[in-house]
Amino acid sequence: MIAKRLLTELDLRDFKALSLYEASIEESILLILSSDHQIEDIKNFHSAINNSVAAALQDKLIIFGVTPTYPATGYGYIKSEKQLDHNNYSASKVDLFIEKPDEKTAKLFIEDKKYSWNSGIFVFKANTILNEIKRFSPEILENCENCLSKSVKDLDFLRLNKTLFLNCENIPIDISVFEKTKKAFVIPLNCGWNDI
């Protein structure tokens, strides 16, 4: 996979920048990730990403789940319909998102095996996520479209209008879309992931 264009957020807006891509790339597959994640096993990371594309092409919104290694209270958790198969990267429907549980609850999640850490890494088709944003958070899409209309192309970058961008609400896409949609699926990610 090779990025054709790059879009960076001017300030933290929890992935709202992705909806600015509506113009001209609605059929594109998008990989959304944070700059503060550590990935130790690049080969497994690439395998997980490449395997997620087939699911994204079926209009599934993919989020990656990391097998918990300890009862973390600083991460969100994802409950999947079935236990994730870490050998074949198969997608399982998301049952529930849980934000930063207490230690006792986190221990129960580890024992259950249907729970994984929310990596905050996403793959989906642009038009699929745009339709879900329009359905569940239309005001976010409207603000982002206004920002896009005043952006400037610069080589491979799209430079956003800072004033309009800062008007976009700062709400995670997990909350604004993924917790509400029926199209959310989780794929296992075993690559030495760490949120630094």
Model features per residue range: what roles?
Residues 7-84, 135-136:
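Conserved beta-loop-beta/alpha segment of the NTase-like Rossmann-fold superfamily
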Residues 6-12, 191-196:
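Short, intrinsically disordered, charge-balanced linker/junction segments flanking boundaries
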Residues 77-196:
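Catalytic core of tubulin tyrosine ligase-like
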Residues 2-3, 26-28, 57-61, 73, ...:
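Short coil/turn connectors at secondary-structure junctions
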Residues 3-8, 141-144:
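Short hydrophobic/aromatic-enriched beta-strand-loop microsegments
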Residues 4-7, 38, 64, 92, ...:
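Residues at structural and domain junctions
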